[in-house]
Amino acid sequence: QNGTLTYNGQAQSPSWNAYNPDALTLGGVTSGTNAGTYTATFTPKGQYKWADGTQTAKEVTWTINAATMTVPTQKNSLTYTGSAQSPTWNNYDSEKMTLGGTTSGTNAGSYNATFTPKTNYKWADGSTGAKTVAWSIAKAAGSLSLNKTSIKLTAAKTTDTITVTRAGDGKITATSSAPTVASVSVSGSVVTVTAKAKGSATITVSVAAGTNHTAPSNKTCSVAVTLPTNVLNDNSWATIREVSSAGLGANYWAVGDMKSIILNGAVVGYTFSNLTVNAFILGFNHNSAKEGANKIHFQIGKIGSTAVALCDSQYNNYGSSAGFRMNTSNTNSGGWNDSYMRKTVLGNTNTPTNPLANSLMAALPSDLRAVMQPVTKYTDNTGNSSNSSGNVTATTDYLFLLAEFEVFGTRSGANQYEQNSQAQYDYYKAGNSRVANNHSAVSTAVWWWLRSPYYNGSNYFRFVNTDGSSDYGNASYSAGV
């Protein structure tokens, strides 16, 4: 055979070295299509003979070589979609090779296909066995979202949850930037945040790469913890309100605990200028069945630890001008409800967020006014020497004077039916002094008003005397508040 033949799908015949058709007769298989070995015969003619002296036919083999192929490789990139996918291939010809092995997949990962040459074909290395070729499906991009980006934890709500939504099955983890302020735990796709102490923290939520998704970028949730401290004065009024509304005040503080406030502004002609005074706790959930639950009752106030009453320049003077009087005329008609003290001095005709000008309510700091809650107080609201049960009715007040029974726990000059709807405050029940001093002269005791009208006279209200005893005085006197 002269030269080589390679399979091309067509019939082919070899050319021959030393072949002379005048001397030799060509026979046997002289053409072929498929790759393989064939046998031709050569027989000397007439006077010709082989070099060995014979004239019989000689068999000569000749071949058609298998066509050479390149092993296929994955042509396209595949990314997880949730459905079955198959790759396309470089150098794949179904006429030349058989595709087997794993030819489709759903999950991200690596798979193995096989390619086996068909008849007439071989690999570039000359082999004809099956070749294993790896192909892959890449992970889809991961995603992560949180149902909350901020959380506020309080005494009333010490835990909260964050729901995590992520693609796939990547493990969810969470960390706190300040675990002593807010701790975290993870169960499934829910992150639970638990308050530990007052402060702020950032919760970082992560999702690891899963079976079919890459790890997404982290997400964060800010946490503000306003848990109270046990020192009342260290807490904001907003925090105190949260604790109060949860009915948890007694869990953190005690009757008598103090928080400082600053009074500023004119109150019916008397001006407070940056007066620091302590409001102290009278009781928790005081008389709640009548007055409303989940409230902390305070009294103003103390300077340092000395009990004081607010006194204007008209203190202990009788008159009709503006001042800290129960009424500007000498009467208790209308009782507590209609009194000048309740409506004008304290400002109960308005609300703390819209205070009456020149009232004590308006002089309170705005952060306190923002969280003040009304209480329902029962008092003789008729006056005029009344002493009947029907005259004891309710008012809704933000600022109020104490009633005789609330201070003393007994009745000496108030309407005898007031006490049926009242309770003595725990502060005074504990035996604390009822003596109050002038806020501007803290060594000088003063008498201070109570809201109870005197039952046996039309001109008087009850008050606490300078020695702490119960007494009554003309409604138009200016006294301590």
Which role does the model predict for each range below?
Residues 1-226:
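Solvent-exposed beta-strand/loop surfaces, strongest in extracytoplasmic domains of secreted
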Residues 228-481:
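Collagenous Gly-X-Y triple-helix signature in extracellular proteins
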